[in-house]
Amino acid sequence: MTSSSTILQRLTQTIEARKSADPAHSYIAKLLSSNEDKVLKKIAEEAAETIMACKDNDREQIIYETADLWFHCLIMLARHDISPEAILSELERREGVSGIEEKLSRSQNQPEPTKAE
């Protein structure tokens, strides 16, 4: 089995390399050069397929569809010049923090909405 960080690095490098590839010859280049809505719709589609696989309790499909979802999320991140390491750092920051506490801290750090005058 390949190290998860190694495959993530290779996928990231491939996606970065495809930024300059011909969209006619590369699916990744096609998504990267298209309207962002195309990528976002693909993520929504893959998320829905992952949900359906979960509802069907189909382990193989859950794995397959989650891989598709993650892959398309990596493409979305690349469009915004966000590295997977930024996401991993955020997950690491949250590690060991209660989800309830983390959510509460976010709401406490939000400015109060102003009333429309």
Curated annotation (Swiss-Prot):
The keyword Plastid does not apply. The gene is hisE. It catalyses: 1-(5-phospho-beta-D-ribosyl)-ATP + H2O = 1-(5-phospho-beta-D-ribosyl)-5'-AMP + diphosphate + H(+). Its EC number is 3.6.1.31. SUPFAM superfamilies: all-alpha NTP pyrophosphatases. One of its GO terms (cellular component) is cytoplasm. HAMAP family: HisE. This is Phosphoribosyl-ATP pyrophosphatase. InterPro entries: HisE, PRib-ATP_PPHydrolase-like. One of its GO terms (biological process) is L-histidine biosynthetic process. Residues 96-117 are annotated as: Disordered. Keywords: Amino-acid biosynthesis, ATP-binding, Cytoplasm, Histidine biosynthesis, Hydrolase, Nucleotide-binding. Pathway: Amino-acid biosynthesis; L-histidine biosynthesis; L-histidine from 5-phospho-alpha-D-ribose 1-diphosphate: step 2/9. The keyword Iron does not apply. Residues 96-105 have a biased composition (Basic and acidic residues). It is found in: Cytoplasm. Residues 106-117 have a biased composition (Polar residues). GO terms for molecular function: ATP binding; phosphoribosyl-ATP diphosphatase activity. Belongs to the PRA-PH family. It is an enzyme of class 3 (hydrolase).
